[in-house]
């Protein structure tokens, strides 16, 4: 007999006239690998007189409690059986006791095809022995269908195909299921239950790619300036539309292009100059916008958590800490005639005050800001321009818990600066003699009032010590270009500086530097430290007043979105467009006459 699907595998049956092999005869199939399989007899046709006990009798050590029931199945349905002893080891058992993992694997080099696809399914009785933690008991038989054995238990047939039966064994055995088949169903159910979560995990691992979101344009970003031709087009299209109301945009564009070509070089230069001026303004506005964005990020990352304010000075008293207030003050040189203590100017490398701001994420881990401040004896205060120029209203910076938290966070961020970073050029003033009478343990409240407007090179500084505790330094600056400077007051015992800017002080011409120390000897330490940060916005810089675009008009333009605030009235708009259009017609008519001549 030849197996379908192959050309070199034959099954030789000895003994003429016998419908099946006896129990003592075996056969050997070549080219099946290194293993030898002892295969029990195979019945070639369905014989009602054949009992399962005759076939299973070859294995004396096996006992099937359901043998009588299987005999009934064989008699009624003519089930073809294949008994095969398979030794199971602990390696084929999963940790849960099911037939998983390496499983029952039979690697056959050649394809095997069931020759009776139309007959009832082939049933393999596999003896499960040497199983300590399995579901089946010792020496107990189970009925496994060939298709489920290959799909569920990993029966690898060396690349060959298996023709599955037309009907499943459940269809044949459903009327009277045997104990072994029900046990097999439980095995399959456990296998599916265990393998189901693995499939879910694989599906969850594949996440769809999120589409990239387009960055929204900031409405505060300055708009790019128009070109010279765009300005000309904007000025002339209204006049063309007035004369030809039904003209389409394409026709208007052609007319404007022709007018631009025939326009004189001087008139073109007018528009080009406008474009250049608009470009310069755009670049300035763009630079300010980008700087504002970067500094806004730095201010947003400052920690606004409210730690205890008195801990800055009360944690470990230091004999002589000094408070360095970094303000936007140009470098000052005290005049010899000014009634001030001996002073000297120390030149240090220029550094940006904004660099003192350190975001919360990059602070050194486990570093206490108060310990740094007290060990070095220096507390650096960020200028008010850094905070108020970022959109913080003055109402929030009044003496309130919010203002204290903002200023305190700025102080803590400033204290993280390494000692080698020094502020810009300092104006050091010697301590007045009466300041030494203050006790080291006293902690007056700090009031920080700074003015961000630019200052004149010469300014008036008034140092006053008032009662109750606070010390105040009043800086009255007239507005001009800023140059960073810090005022440092050295104190042997304890010196707390309150920098207050009098907002009501008007801008004044350059004045001498005056330091007027007024100290109250008896001061009691306050219960807590009040920190306030108040700042005013700088006045806008003066610029030449714009004029109306129409030639000959000296009036100032009015605010109008349609004409970009370039005309003083609608009459000027019409006159300007009419003059431009008439100039174009005149230039065109001259060109036509020249061509006719």
UniProtKB/Swiss-Prot annotation:
Q: Where in the cell is it found?
A: Nucleus; Chromosome
Membrane-crossing ranges are none
Q: Which GO terms describe its biological process?
A: positive regulation of transcription elongation by RNA polymerase II; RNA polymerase II promoter clearance
Keyword field contains Nucleus:
yes
Compositional bias of kind Basic residues: 207-217
Record's InterPro entries?
Answer: HMG_box_dom, HMG_box_dom_sf, TOX_HMG-box_domain
Concerning Pfam families, the annotation shows: HMG_box
Q: Function, please?
A: Transcription factor that modulates cell fate reprogramming from the somatic state to the pluripotent and neuronal fate. Also acts as a regulatory component of protein phosphatase 1 (PP1) complexes. Component of the PNUTS-PP1 protein phosphatase complex, a PP1 complex that regulates RNA polymerase II transcription pause-release. PNUTS-PP1 also plays a role in the control of chromatin structure and cell cycle progression during the transition from mitosis into interphase.
Q: Which PANTHER family match?
A: AGAP000281-PA, TOX HIGH MOBILITY GROUP BOX FAMILY MEMBER 4
State the name under which the record lists this protein: TOX high mobility group box family member 4
């Amino acid at each position: 007999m030849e197996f379908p699907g192959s050309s070199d595998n034959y099954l030789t049956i000895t003994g003429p006239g016998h419908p099946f092999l006896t129990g003592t005869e075996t056969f050997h199939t070549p080219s099946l690998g290194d293993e030898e399989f002892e295969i029990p007899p195979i019945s070639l046709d369905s014989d009602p007189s054949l009992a399962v006990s005759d076939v299973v009798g070859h294995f004396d050590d096996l006992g099937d409690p359901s043998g009588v029931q299987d005999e009934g199945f064989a008699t009624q349905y003519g089930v073809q059986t294949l008994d095969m002893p398979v030794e199971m080891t602990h390696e084929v058992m999963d940790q849960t006791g099911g037939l998983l993992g390496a499983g029952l694997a039979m690697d056959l080099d050649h394809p095997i095809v069931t020759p009776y696809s139309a007959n009832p399914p082939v049933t393999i009785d596999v003896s499960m022995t040497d199983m300590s933690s399995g579901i089946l008991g010792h020496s107990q038989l189970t009925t496994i269908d060939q298709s489920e054995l290959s799909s569920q238990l990993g029966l690898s047939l060396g690349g060959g195909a298996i023709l599955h039966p037309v009907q499943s064994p459940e269809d044949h055995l459903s009327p009277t299921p045997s104990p072994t088949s029900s046990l097999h169903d439980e095995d399959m159910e456990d296998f599916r239950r265990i393998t189901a979560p693995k499939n879910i995990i694989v599906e969850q691992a594949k996440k769809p790619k999120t589409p990239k979101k387009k960055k929204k344009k900031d409405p505060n970003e300055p708009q790019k300036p128009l070109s010279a031709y765009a300005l000309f087009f904007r000025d002339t299209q209204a006049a063309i539309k007035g004369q030809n109301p039904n003209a389409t945009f394409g026709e208007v564009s052609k007319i404007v292009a022709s007018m631009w070509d025939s326009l004189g070089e001087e008139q073109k230069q007018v528009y080009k100059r406008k474009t250049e001026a608009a470009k310069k303004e755009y670049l300035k506005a763009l630079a300010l916008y980008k700087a504002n964005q970067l500094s806004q990020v730095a201010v947003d990352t400052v920690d606004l958590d409210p730690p205890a304010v008195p801990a800055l000075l009360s944690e470990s008293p230091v004999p002589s800490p000094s408070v360095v207030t970094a303000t936007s003050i140009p470098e000052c040189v005290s005049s010899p005639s000014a009634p001030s203590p001996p002073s000297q100017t120390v030149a240090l490398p220029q550094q940006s005050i904004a660099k003192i701001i350190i975001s919360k994420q990059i602070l050194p881990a486990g570093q206490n800001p108060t310990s740094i401040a007290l060990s070095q004896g220096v507390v650096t205060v960020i200028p008010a321009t850094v905070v108020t120029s970022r959109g913080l209203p003055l109402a929030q910076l009044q003496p309130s818990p919010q203002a204290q938290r903002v200023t305190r966070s700025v102080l803590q961020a400033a204290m993280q600066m390494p000692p080698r970073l020094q502020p810009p050029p300092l104006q050091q003033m010697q301590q007045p003699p009466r300041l030494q009478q203050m006790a080291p343990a006293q902690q007056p409240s700090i009031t920080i009032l700074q003015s961000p407007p630019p200052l004149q090179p010469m300014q008036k500084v008034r140092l006053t010590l008032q009662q109750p505790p606070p010390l105040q330094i009043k800086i009255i600056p007239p507005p001009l270009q800023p140059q960073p400077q810090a005022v440092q007051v050295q104190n042997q015992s304890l010196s707390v500086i309150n920098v207050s800017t009098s907002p009501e002080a008007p801008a004044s011409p350059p004045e001498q530097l005056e330091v007027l120390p007024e100290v109250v000897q008896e001061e009691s330490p306050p219960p807590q430290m009040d920190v306030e940060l108040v700042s005013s916005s700088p006045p806008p810089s003066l610029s030449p007043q714009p004029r109306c675009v129409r030639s000959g008009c000296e009036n100032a333009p009015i605010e109008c979105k349609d004409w970009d605030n370039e005309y003083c009235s609608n009459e000027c708009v019409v006159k300007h467009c009419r003059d431009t259009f008439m100039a174009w017609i005149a230039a065109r008519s001259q060109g036509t006459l020249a061509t006719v001549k």
